[in-house]
Swiss-Prot record:
Enzyme class: translocase
The UniProt record lists the keyword Hydrolase: no
SUPFAM superfamilies per the UniProt record, alphabetical: Helical scaffold and wing domains of SecA, P-loop containing nucleoside triphosphate hydrolases, Pre-protein crosslinking domain of SecA
EC number, as in UniProt: 7.4.2.8
Function as written in the Swiss-Prot or TrEMBL entry: Part of the Sec protein translocase complex. Interacts with the SecYEG preprotein conducting channel. Has a central role in coupling the hydrolysis of ATP to the transfer of proteins into and across the cell membrane, serving both as a receptor for the preprotein-SecB complex and as an ATP-driven molecular motor driving the stepwise translocation of polypeptide chains across the membrane.
Name of the featured protein: Protein translocase subunit SecA 1
Reaction catalysis annotation: ATP + H2O + cellular proteinSide 1 = ADP + phosphate + cellular proteinSide 2
Top-level taxon of the source organism: Bacteria
Positions bound to ATP: 86, 104-108, 512
Subunit structure and binding partners: Monomer and homodimer. Part of the essential Sec protein translocation apparatus which comprises SecA, SecYEG and auxiliary proteins SecDF-YajC and YidC.
Chief localisation class: membrane
Gene: secA1
PANTHER family: CHLOROPLAST PROTEIN-TRANSPORTING ATPASE, SECA INNER MEMBRANE COMPONENT OF SEC PROTEIN SECRETION SYSTEM
Length: 910
């Protein structure tokens, strides 16, 4: 019935494309008129559009003309004309949707259409890329078109001086990575001066490779952290425990005897669980090693941290392996991203896991970190007024984009029909049989002059395959995290005749593989040669292109690019991304995945079913199954994994939404403090509320004198706020004194004491001091609150055993924690301001600078691929920033990481 309706009225995608094609017709009709304009007249269109928009013309109404102008500018600047398919994609992006376009269809050029149109509003457009190389490349490349049309571009990258970053955000169009945009948002909410903030609002963002950023990286929050308590010795001692515990043969099953052993590993959830006997064994081992005192239990409240450290050590030994999840580089454990295979310099696992892995590998253990600020990509990108994205593979995750981000996916038809042939998977019994078949396929392609791209899921597998190819004397390139610096160069050469390239997952994404090899690098070198005249440059470029044509034809005749997958990823989308490297813009190509029953995905999710099929068919050794049924069975397993991962992300989001609501409230209050001309009235309200609450603790409202604890109140006022008041004498001297009158006298005494301090140092200096103390208190208590929320979340699932809804309990308790935090901020601010002894303006300035410095000590930034570029640019980026504050000179860089001199940043707070 549903398919019949689709035939009659078309799918939602068909109906959207039908609407968009009407706009494409309008744009095409404008082409001759726009083409007739001179360069000056074309450039003047930008100001004309801005004037019309300021007078009320909507961006939707400007779209046909603006897109026609960009298309014409593209022809004049690049010699490239936007295809109709790119216009369709541009319209989808402007309408806040995800445009799915095949690899090689020109997503980068397509983005110029909605970017230009939305930049007319002068609110700033953010173009989000997956790495710094692509951000710089696209800003430089597309910037030529924007500058031709009179628009400014900027790019934000790690370790950029603050002045440059602010200028980049003030540009009409800003390029950068998802990490940098997110971190800058967090940094802006940690600043002590309005003028140091970078971003000017979140109006419109286009996210390139949107599936990678909004789905693959959505489980990892962005975290700015500082050093916490040192547990180095405990990690080293706890590292001796896992080898002494015995792993069980399998997971215990209900109503069956528990297998012998101390623990089992759940590979699906990436967790380790102790058995009943395992708990006893662990206590004995910890006691024997002197970690747990004799006769005491691991479950005593004071030993709960030991349990956590032991489980982390177990996970490090059983679930995290060298050259799979991490590598050792320069004596440090560096994480390998599971989706891209890239090294994540600067990123560290949390909850002590990174330290446990360091202890396992015998490298220097670095300090644990305390979270200073944190946000997930889901919550960061949902703050944009309008969000859109582009990718080659979004359709498999369309439901999640709609559910989480309210983003609809529009599949854009290819400019030319796709010719790639996707062959059925071949499944072997063992890895050895699988690799033999892969070698035979690669050898055949190499001999026929067909380029091959082999996709692996880990560095270990890529190096294993590389070793096999070396033995077979087959020349090849390896593209994994260890060769990241040469990534673009290796990818550019991957299309040459007979070339063999091994790539870890989707390393090299964003650079096209051109059949016959890329000539762009040679052309760029010719263009940059100042010794050549324009005529000589043109002649040489033409010669290079002519030499490339026979190579291109040779590769096409051999069948185009051959894609070989050595394993299925747990996400169909990652497999599709690998396949999508072949068959660009109507080129020929083919793909095949080789699998074995020993592959992790097959072993965990689909192995039993496929093994049963192989046994029934009685296939000889080395003979694979190759059938659509098997491929479908594997895809069913992948759907299960995708569904589970979606549930995990959705559940994480539901919990993070609680923290996000609190973050919005706190950051809004912090910004009010930062932006207000004076916060004296706010401080007065806080002080009066704090005094009243303290007073009512000793003198209840509407109570009689016999219920009053005047001695206790007098002592509390003196110790908490240094208010020396003869309250007992007042009450004795005035028998008719009411509690309200007494409260008013206490409030007035507090006001008088406070005013005297303000008058002593001057209103302006005191106002700055108030602001600094308020900001410091907010930041300190927010850090503690984030840690409290983490602990709450880790144990909240246990409420399910008490027949309570863990999510509801988390919301309720998180709200109580937040309310308590706001009260502590108030009390802290009032206590400091009431008890501080001031004698001069200089002392206030010194206290204020110290407050700011304590806030910015030992700052680090964490996320999956943050600081990739820094791994090659600056080795110190991998080390925590350890500033010894008294040594910061006035002309040194400020410890806050802003890039400014100390005297121009936190050294200048007064």
């Amino acid at each position: 019935m549903v398919s019949l309706l689709k035939k009659l009225i078309g799918s939602r995608n068909d109906r959207l494309l039908k609407q968009y094609r009407k706009l494409v017709t309008q744009i095409n009709n404008l082409e001759p008129q726009i083409a007739a304009l001179s360069d000056e007249a074309l450039q003047a269109k930008t100001q004309e559009f801005r004037d019309r928009h300021a007078k009320g013309t909507s961006l939707d109404d400007l779209l046909p003309e603006a897109f026609a102008v960009v298309r014409e500018a593209g022809k004049r600047v690049f010699g490239m004309r936007h295809f109709d398919a790119q216009l369709l994609g541009g319209i989808a992006l402007h309408n806040g949707k995800i445009a799915e376009m095949r690899t090689g269809e020109g997503k980068t050029l397509m983005a110029t259409l909605p970017v230009y149109l939305n930049a007319i509003a002068a609110k700033g457009v953010h173009v989000v890329t997956v790495n710094d190389y692509l951000a710089r490349r696209d800003a430089d490349w597309m910037g030529r078109l924007y500058r031709f049309l009179g628009m400014s571009t900027g790019v934000v990258v790690p370790q950029q001086p603050n002045e440059e970053k602010i200028a980049a955000y003030r540009a009409d169009i800003t390029y950068g990575t998802n990490n940098e945009f997110g971190f800058d948002y967090l940094r802006d909410n940690m600043e002590y001066r309005v003028e140091d903030r970078r971003q000017r609002g979140l109006a419109y963002a286009i996210v390139d490779e949107v599936d990678s950023i909004l789905i693959d990286e959505a489980r990892t929050p962005l975290i700015i952290s500082g050093q916490a308590e040192d547990h180095t010795e405990l990690y080293v001692r706890m590292n001796a425990v896992p080898p002494l515990l015995k792993r069980m043969a399998g997971e215990p099953k209900p109503h069956e005897p528990e297998p012998e052993g101390d623990y089992w590993v759940d590979e699906k959830s990436q967790q380790v669980h102790l058995s009943e006997s395992g708990h006893e064994s662990a206590e004995k081992i910890l006691t024997r090693l002197g970690i747990l005192p004799e006769g005491e239990s691991l479950y005593d409240p004071r030993h709960i941290a030991l349990m956590h450290h032991m489980m982390v050590a177990l996970r490090a030994h059983t679930l995290f392996f060298l050259d799979q999840q991490y590598v050792i580089q320069d004596g440090e454990v560096v994480i390998v991203d599971e989706f891209t295979g890239r090294l994540m310099a600067g990123r560290r696992w949390s909850d002590g896991l990174h330290q446990a892995v360091e202890a396992k590998e015998g490298v220097k253990i670095q300090h644990e970190n305390q979270t200073l600020a944190s946000i997930t990509f889901q919550n960061y990108f949902r703050m944009y007024e309008k969000l859109s994205g582009m990718t080659g593979t979004a359709d498999t995750e369309a439901y999640e984009f709609q559910e989480i981000y309210s983003l609809e996916t529009v599949i854009i038809p290819t400019n030319k029909p796709m010719q790639r042939k996707d062959q059925n998977d071949q499944v072997f019994r063992t890895s050895q049989e699988k690799y033999n078949a892969i070698l035979n396929d690669i050898r055949d392609c190499h001999e026929r002059g067909q380029p091959v791209l082999v996709g692996t899921t880990s560095i270990e597998n890529s190096e294993l395959l590389s070793g096999l190819l070396k033995k077979a004397k087959l020349p090849h390139e390896v593209l994994n995290a260890k060769q990241h610096a040469r990534e673009a160069e290796i990818v550019a050469e991957a299309g040459k005749p007979g070339h063999i390239t091994i790539a870890t997952n989707m390393a090299g994404r964003g650079t096209d593989i051109v059949l016959g090899g890329s000539v762009e690098k040679q052309i760029d070198l010719i263009r940059a040669d100042e010794n050549l005249s324009e005529a000589e440059k043109t002649a040489r470029i033409e010669r290079v292109r002519q030499e490339w044509k026979p190579l291109n034809e040779q590769v096409k005749a051999a069948g185009g690019l051959r894609i070989i997958g050595t394993e299925r990823h747990e996400s169909r989308r990652i497999d599709n991304q690998l396949r999508g490297r072949a068959g660009r813009q109507g080129d020929p190509g083919s793909s095949r995945f080789y699998l074995s029953l020993e592959d992790p995905l097959m072993r965990i999710f689909a192995g039993d079913r496929v093994r049963a099929i192989m046994e029934r068919l009685k296939l000889p050794e080395g003979e694979p199954i190759e059938a659509g049924m098997v491929t479908r069975s594997i895809e069913t397993a992948q759907r299960k994994v995708e569904g589970r991962n979606f549930d995990i992300r959705k559940q994480l989001l539901e919990y993070d939404d609680v923290a996000n609501d609190q973050r919005k409230v706190l950051y809004a209050q912090r910004n009010d403090v930062l932006e207000a001309k004076t916060i004296g009235a706010s401080v007065e309200n806080l002080r009066d509320a704090a005094v009243t609450e303290l007073f009512r603790g000793f003198v209840p409202a509407e109570s009689v004198e016999e219920q009053w604890d005047i001695a206790g109140l007098q002592q509390a006022l003196a110790s908490d706020w240094q208010l020396q008041l003869p309250l007992a004498e007042m009450v004795e001297a005035e028998p008719k004194l009411t509690d309200e009158e007494l409260l008013e006298r206490v409030l007035q005494a507090a006001r008088d004491t406070y005013r005297s301090k303000s008058e002593l140092v001057g209103e302006e200096s005191w106002g700055q001091f108030e602001r600094s103390i308020m900001l410091q208190s907010i930041d300190t208590h927010w850090r503690e609150h984030l840690s409290a929320l983490d602990y709450l979340r880790q144990g909240i699932h246990l409420r399910g055993y008490a027949q309570k809804n863990p999510k509801q309990e988390y919301k309720r308790e998180a709200f109580e924690l937040f309310s308590g935090m706001l009260d502590r901020i108030r009390d802290d601010v009032v206590r400091v301001l009431m008890t501080v002894r001031v004698q001069s303006t200089e002392q206030v300035a010194q206290a204020e600078a110290e407050a700011a410095q304590s806030h910015v000590q030992n700052v680090q930034f964490h996320h999956s691929d943050y600081d990739e570029a820094l791994a090659s640019e600056a080795a110190e980026a991998q080390e925590p920033v350890r500033n010894v504050l008294p040594k910061v000179g006035r002309n040194d860089a400020c410890p806050c990481g802003s890039g400014k001199k100390y005297k121009q940043c936190h050294g200048k707070l007064t």
